């Protein structure tokens, strides 16, 4: 019989990265600006309210920056390289947001826009900052992957979350490569129709065609989802004895990560076939059922791994 201890969340070893937190705060303010813009500005750009895209980007950057700053704080020491790369992320993000909000003020779209020399130049700059942001995140991710940031379940949730996030960021490259069918627009996120098709509430994702923004969004936020799940399992452990076993929690995290990656592959495949998220065909439903089955089996195996762990010791 092995001994179980009631787990606790890992504590930060270094201060939160200030530039990342300042950037998160600035984007939180931009969310307010965007919401006000949606209320008072009735302009439409690329089929949706003008302030919808910048508001979404601001919200995304808030979560992304806070999560990255928190994960970095869990390292016993923060290397100069990691800190510098985090600052690079901030600089790239600032440039991106300045262009996105600036283009809205001008009354034109930011992404894929090559209508004028200025628009084309801004789009090239945006494309460059996206690559820089990806590479900086990759360097930070490699450093975090090599470190032990808590128990095995927390550590692996971070490692796998970073890996899936990098895939999600990379999937963004699918959009500029697509033919838009519209003069002056170099790229598209809609598959099977020009951008601007009817969209879902809140997200704006196409309800009539495939939408490559879905896998991009879903993938890049694994950085928040999986570590949050691991933290939730730790928080619930005092009330649910089964979760006091690190083996069980690790198994659940691996299962969740595999399921997350599988869903990412599924929504990418679905989008590339020109199929809207809310109207799956039989092939998509069959694949989804297989993923659900695999996750259920993984959960059962993880729970079964707790056999023989009975005694509980409070840490």
Model-derived features: where do they sit?
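Aromatic-rich transmembrane-lumenal/periplasmic boundary elements in polytopic membrane proteins
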Residues: 153-190
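Membrane-interfacial catalytic/cofactor-binding modules of polytopic membrane enzymes
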Residues: 176-223
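Short, Lys/Arg-rich, polar N-terminal cytosolic tail immediately upstream
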Residues: 1-16
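Internal, conserved structured core segments that host functional sites
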Residues: 112-149
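Membrane-interfacial loop-to-helix junctions in multi-pass inner-membrane proteins
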Residues: 15-17, 79-90, 151-158
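Non-cytosolic membrane-interface motifs at loop->transmembrane helix junctions
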Residues: 45-54, 112-125, 152-156, 276-287
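Hydrophobic cores of alpha-helical transmembrane segments in multi-pass integral membrane proteins
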Residues: 19-39, 51-73, 87-105, 125-140, ...
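Membrane-interface capping segments at transmembrane-helix boundaries
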Residues: 298-315
């Amino acid at each position: 019989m092995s001994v179980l201890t009631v787990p606790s969340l890992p504590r930060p070893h270094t201060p939160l990265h200030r530039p990342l937190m300042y950037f998160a705060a600035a984007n939180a303010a931009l969310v307010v600006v965007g919401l006000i813009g949606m209320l008072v500005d009735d302009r439409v750009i690329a089929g949706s309210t003008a302030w919808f895209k910048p508001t979404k980007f601001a919200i995304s950057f808030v979560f992304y920056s806070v999560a990255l700053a928190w994960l970095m704080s869990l390292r016993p020491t923060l290397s100069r390289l990691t800190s510098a790369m985090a600052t690079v992320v901030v600089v790239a993000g600032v440039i991106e947001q300045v262009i996105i909000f600036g283009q809205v003020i001008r009354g034109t779209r930011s992404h894929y826009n090559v209508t004028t020399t200025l628009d084309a130049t801004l789009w090239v700059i945006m494309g460059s900052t996206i690559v820089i942001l990806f590479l900086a995140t990759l360097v930070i991710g490699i450093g975090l992957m090599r470190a032990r940031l808590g128990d095995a379940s927390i550590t692996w949730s971070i490692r796998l979350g970073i890996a899936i996030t990098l895939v999600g960021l990379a999937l963004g490259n699918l959009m500029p490569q697509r033919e838009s069918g519209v003069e002056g627009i170099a790229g598209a996120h809609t598959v099977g129709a020009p951008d601007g098709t009817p969209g879902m509430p809140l997200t704006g994702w196409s309800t009539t065609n495939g939408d490559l923004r879905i896998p991009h969004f879903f993938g890049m936020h694994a950085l928040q989802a999986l570590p949050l799940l691991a933290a939730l399992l730790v928080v619930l452990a005092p009330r649910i004895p089964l979760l006091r076993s690190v083996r069980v929690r690790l198994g659940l995290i691996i299962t969740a990560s595999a399921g997350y990656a599988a869903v990412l592959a599924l929504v990418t495949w679905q989008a590339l076939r020109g199929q809207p998220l809310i109207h799956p065909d039989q092939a998509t439903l069959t694949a989804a059922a297989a993923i659900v089955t695999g996750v259920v089996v993984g959960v059962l195996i993880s729970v079964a791994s707790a056999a023989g762990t009975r005694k509980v010791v409070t840490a």
